[in-house]
Amino acid sequence: MATTTCQVVGLLLSLLGLAGCIAATGMDMWSTQDLYDNPVTAVFQYEGLWRSCVQQSSGFTECRPYFTILGLPAMLQAVRALMIVGIVLGVIGILVSIFALKCIRIGSMDDSAKAKMTLTSGILFIISGICAIIGVSVFANMLVTNFWMSTANMYSGMGGMGGMVQTVQTRYTFGAALFVGWVAGGLTLIGGVMMCIACRGLTPDDSNFKAVSYHASGQNVAYRPGGFKASTGFGSNTRNKKIYDGGARTEDDEQSHPTKYDYV
């Protein structure tokens, strides 16, 4: 029951994280215009992985897709690739994990095969979550670098009053898509870890010792009392031996060395 619960929870978390990764990849607000100390408030700009948008104060929004691939920054293309790879791996992991559920029986599939499928889906989810987190973090680092470079250019020394002249430049800060991507990547990563933990519950324990068959009556050993009879030298020893209940073993089987009751 614990294994099935762990599988289901891991699958649901990974499914939710995958949906968040898809939503974050398609969102336009990866970077939004920083309105702090900005005299121009009639126009609000924001950019995504696939297009840039301009929203006017009247509510009209115009988006323009990126019509080039080679002309885009290399970091932006890397973020695109990471997010797409994470989504593809997440979809494959979802399909594998559905068939790996312990509560679903498909033909003669045993638990060892389900354990391998569960481990595979868990690894796929972990890689998918890592790709999403790395992609979002790379884009965030690019935003931070550009932000401080723009800030330095705004207050560059160009003479004038106090030797400082402030120029108006558009600075971008974190958008909502970054936070969605971070949360989605974390959920996918946690779901993958739970699937890997559930794999241990499906793996047969090979460290157990092999079972040894024995007679149940051997636990309570009782003796049959009997006297001793003198034997002749021509026949076998006719004395009564202590016999164990539940088996054909006699006292000679248990003790082979001579005793004081042996006669010639």
From Swiss-Prot:
Keywords: Cell junction, Cell membrane, Membrane, Phosphoprotein, Tight junction, Transmembrane, Transmembrane helix. The chain crosses the membrane at residues 7-27, 81-101, 123-143, 177-197. Induction: Induced by 17-beta-estradiol in bone marrow stromal cells, osteoblasts and osteoclasts. Residues 198-264 are annotated as: Required for role in regulation of RANKL-induced osteoclast differentiation. GO terms for cellular component: bicellular tight junction; cell-cell junction; lateral plasma membrane; plasma membrane; tight junction. Its main location: other. Disruption phenotype: Parenchymal expansion phenotype and overall lung enlargement evident from 18 days post-conception (dpc), as a result of increased lung cellularity, airspace enlargement and increase in the number of AT2 cells in the lung alveolar compartments. Increase in AT2 cells in S and G2/M phase of the cell cycle with no change in low levels of apoptosis in the lungs. Increase in bronchoalveolar lavage fluid leakage as a result of alveolar epithelial cell injury at P3 and four weeks of age, resulting in an increase in AT2 cells in the lungs by four weeks of age. Involved in alveolar fluid homeostasis via regulation of alveolar epithelial tight junction composition and therefore ion transport and solute permeability, potentially via downstream regulation of the actin cytoskeleton organization and beta-2-adrenergic signaling. Required for lung alveolarization and maintenance of the paracellular alveolar epithelial barrier. Acts to maintain epithelial progenitor cell proliferation and organ size, via regulation of YAP1 localization away from the nucleus and thereby restriction of YAP1 target gene transcription. GO terms for molecular function: identical protein binding; structural molecule activity. Belongs to the claudin family. Expressed in the lung (at protein level). Residues 1-6, 102-122, 198-264 are cytoplasmic. Residues 28-80, 144-176 are extracellular. This is Claudin-18. It comes from the Eukaryota. One of its GO terms (biological process) is tight junction assembly. It is found in: Cell junction, Tight junction; Cell membrane. PROSITE patterns: CLAUDIN. The keyword Nucleus does not apply. The modification Phosphoserine is found at S217. Residues 241-264 are annotated as: Disordered. Residues 242-264 have a biased composition (Basic and acidic residues). Interacts with TJP2/ZO-2. Interacts with TJP1/ZO-1. Interacts with YAP1 (phosphorylated); the interaction sequesters YAP1 away from the nucleus and thereby restricts transcription of YAP1 target genes. It comes from Mus musculus (Mouse). May act as a tumor suppressor, inhibiting the development of AT2 cell-derived lung tumors. It is a multi-pass membrane protein.
